[in-house]
UniProtKB/Swiss-Prot annotation:
It comes from Streptomyces scabiei. Signal peptide: none annotated. Transmembrane segments: none annotated. SUPFAM superfamilies: Ribosomal proteins L15p and L18e (SSF52080). Pfam families: Ribosomal_L27A (PF00828). Keywords: Ribonucleoprotein, Ribosomal protein, RNA-binding, rRNA-binding. GO terms for molecular function: rRNA binding; structural constituent of ribosome. GO terms for biological process: translation. Belongs to the universal ribosomal protein uL15 family. This is Large ribosomal subunit protein uL15.
Length: 96
Protein backbone atom coordinates (compact mmCIF):
# COMPACT_ATOMS: atom_id res chain seq x y z
CA UNK A 1 0.00 0.00 0.00
CA UNK A 2 0.88 3.67 0.05
CA UNK A 3 3.35 4.89 2.70
CA UNK A 4 1.44 6.84 5.38
CA UNK A 5 1.80 10.63 5.34
CA UNK A 6 3.29 10.84 8.84
CA UNK A 7 6.06 8.46 7.75
CA UNK A 8 6.70 10.28 4.45
CA UNK A 9 7.32 13.66 6.09
CA UNK A 10 10.83 14.37 7.43
CA UNK A 11 11.45 14.33 11.18
CA UNK A 12 12.33 17.57 12.95
CA UNK A 13 16.00 17.53 13.82
CA UNK A 14 18.09 19.72 16.06
CA UNK A 15 17.35 22.00 18.97
CA UNK A 16 15.54 25.34 19.10
CA UNK A 17 16.50 27.54 22.05
CA UNK A 18 13.27 29.12 23.37
CA UNK A 19 15.24 31.86 25.19
CA UNK A 20 17.22 33.12 22.17
CA UNK A 21 17.36 36.92 21.84
CA UNK A 22 16.93 38.20 18.29
CA UNK A 23 18.31 41.66 17.55
CA UNK A 24 17.52 43.90 14.61
CA UNK A 25 20.87 45.21 13.42
CA UNK A 26 21.73 48.74 12.31
CA UNK A 27 25.21 49.45 10.96
CA UNK A 28 27.15 52.68 11.43
CA UNK A 29 26.94 53.56 7.73
CA UNK A 30 23.12 53.50 8.03
CA UNK A 31 23.28 55.75 11.12
CA UNK A 32 25.61 58.14 9.28
CA UNK A 33 23.09 58.35 6.41
CA UNK A 34 20.09 58.83 8.75
CA UNK A 35 21.80 61.40 11.01
CA UNK A 36 24.15 63.44 8.75
CA UNK A 37 24.42 66.29 11.30
CA UNK A 38 24.73 64.03 14.35
CA UNK A 39 22.48 64.23 17.40
CA UNK A 40 20.57 61.81 19.61
CA UNK A 41 19.76 58.28 18.39
CA UNK A 42 17.06 56.29 20.21
CA UNK A 43 15.07 53.17 19.33
CA UNK A 44 11.92 55.31 18.91
CA UNK A 45 13.78 57.58 16.44
CA UNK A 46 14.95 54.59 14.41
CA UNK A 47 11.40 53.18 14.30
CA UNK A 48 10.05 56.58 13.20
CA UNK A 49 12.66 56.80 10.41
CA UNK A 50 11.83 53.25 9.27
CA UNK A 51 15.26 51.76 10.00
CA UNK A 52 13.88 49.08 12.35
CA UNK A 53 10.52 47.56 13.30
CA UNK A 54 8.89 48.39 16.61
CA UNK A 55 8.66 46.03 19.61
CA UNK A 56 12.03 44.38 19.03
CA UNK A 57 15.59 44.75 20.31
CA UNK A 58 18.05 46.91 18.34
CA UNK A 59 21.80 46.34 18.12
CA UNK A 60 24.28 48.72 16.48
CA UNK A 61 27.12 47.04 14.57
CA UNK A 62 30.38 48.60 13.42
CA UNK A 63 30.25 48.28 9.62
CA UNK A 64 31.10 51.59 7.94
CA UNK A 65 32.59 54.82 9.25
CA UNK A 66 31.05 57.68 11.21
CA UNK A 67 32.35 61.25 11.46
CA UNK A 68 29.62 63.07 13.45
CA UNK A 69 28.99 62.91 17.21
CA UNK A 70 26.01 60.70 18.04
CA UNK A 71 24.40 60.08 21.44
CA UNK A 72 23.31 56.46 20.88
CA UNK A 73 20.76 54.86 23.25
CA UNK A 74 19.88 51.34 22.03
CA UNK A 75 19.55 47.81 23.44
CA UNK A 76 23.06 46.60 22.50
CA UNK A 77 26.20 47.86 20.75
CA UNK A 78 29.13 45.85 19.38
CA UNK A 79 32.64 46.61 20.58
CA UNK A 80 33.85 47.99 17.24
CA UNK A 81 30.78 50.25 16.93
CA UNK A 82 31.32 51.58 20.47
CA UNK A 83 34.96 52.41 19.66
CA UNK A 84 34.05 54.24 16.45
CA UNK A 85 31.20 56.23 18.05
CA UNK A 86 33.33 57.38 21.00
CA UNK A 87 36.26 58.16 18.66
CA UNK A 88 33.93 60.46 16.69
CA UNK A 89 33.03 62.29 19.92
CA UNK A 90 29.74 60.54 20.67
CA UNK A 91 28.39 58.59 23.63
CA UNK A 92 26.87 55.11 23.95
CA UNK A 93 24.16 53.96 26.39
CA UNK A 94 23.04 50.32 26.38
CA UNK A 95 19.56 49.45 27.67
CA UNK A 96 20.00 45.67 28.06
Amino acid sequence: GQMPLHMRLPKLKGFKNPFKTEFQVVNLDKLAALYPEGGEVTVADLVAKGAVRKNSLVKVLGQGEISVALQVTVDAVSGSAKEKITAAGGTVTELV
